[in-house]
C-alpha cells in the first residue's frame, strides 16, 4: 500500500432528472465501457417501469431497496497465530451504500428477464419488498457475522 497521499474523493454531479447523487452513483456503477447514455436509459427506463407498476415515486422505491440491501455488519479475515478468523466488523456508511449498489446490480444481471431494464425493475421492486437475491445476500452476510460473533474481540 502506498505511503504517499490518499486519492482525493471526486465530486460527482447529481443526475439531471431527479437531482439525486445516489442515482448518479448507481448509473456510474451500471455503466460499461464508458457508455453513460446507455446506463442512463437503463436506469430511467427501470424507474419508469417501477412507477407504472407500483404507482409510487421511483426514487423513494430505489432508496428503500438500497436500505433493505445494505449490510450493517460483515466479516473480515484476521490472521492470529497461524489461524485465520472471520471477525465481524461494522460497515462504514459509504461502504454500505457501495455494497448495496454493487449487490443490486449483480442480482439484476443474474435475473432471467429479457432486457436489463426489466431485470433492474424486478430486482428493485423485490428489494423494496424485502425479497430477491440481493436481500438474500445481505441476510447471508449478517448470518455469517452472527455465526462468528465469538471472534468479535479480535476487532481492529
Swiss-Prot record:
GO terms for molecular function: rRNA binding; structural constituent of ribosome; tRNA binding. InterPro entries: Ribosomal_uS7, Ribosomal_uS7_bac/org-type, Ribosomal_uS7_CS, Ribosomal_uS7_dom, Ribosomal_uS7_dom_sf. Pfam families: Ribosomal_S7. Keywords: Ribonucleoprotein, Ribosomal protein, RNA-binding, rRNA-binding, tRNA-binding. The keyword tRNA-binding applies. GO terms for biological process: translation. GO terms for cellular component: small ribosomal subunit. One of the primary rRNA binding proteins, it binds directly to 16S rRNA where it nucleates assembly of the head domain of the 30S subunit. Is located at the subunit interface close to the decoding center, probably blocks exit of the E-site tRNA. Belongs to the universal ribosomal protein uS7 family. Part of the 30S ribosomal subunit. Contacts proteins S9 and S11. PANTHER family: RIBOSOMAL PROTEIN S7. This is Small ribosomal subunit protein uS7. It comes from Sinorhizobium fredii (strain NBRC 101917 / NGR234).
